[in-house]
């Protein structure tokens, strides 16, 4: 079993912890945060926790901040997982490059490419042939219809419907 260190103990961090716990891959989950009593330490001290049996996950809702932390962790060779809730559906013909969270009830259909640091939130649907560039957040219940190419760090607000090929 492994340990998971989540950077950020806010709402998204709590969600990541909940989903990670449900995957059964971790026997210990802890937080680093600069302003939370739930944290064992501050984010900048993450280097003190690097080990072969520890994964890190930057759980910041700010897309640019999350992607920045991902690059920082990767440069130091930290292990950063993709976390997929057991009730989410990700087509076996979809490619998730790395370090993405797919939350409960989300659907990612066939032929999609999901790049690093994306959040596909509860009940969101990403239909066939879409590409999500790094840091994209598809919020609660949003629908991204087929063959869209969403730009880096785009936020698709809750309940939004993006029509077929609206973003090329």
Task: Give the predicted meaning of each segment.
Residues 3, 27-29, 55, 79-80:
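Residues at the starts of beta-strands that form the adenosine-phosphate
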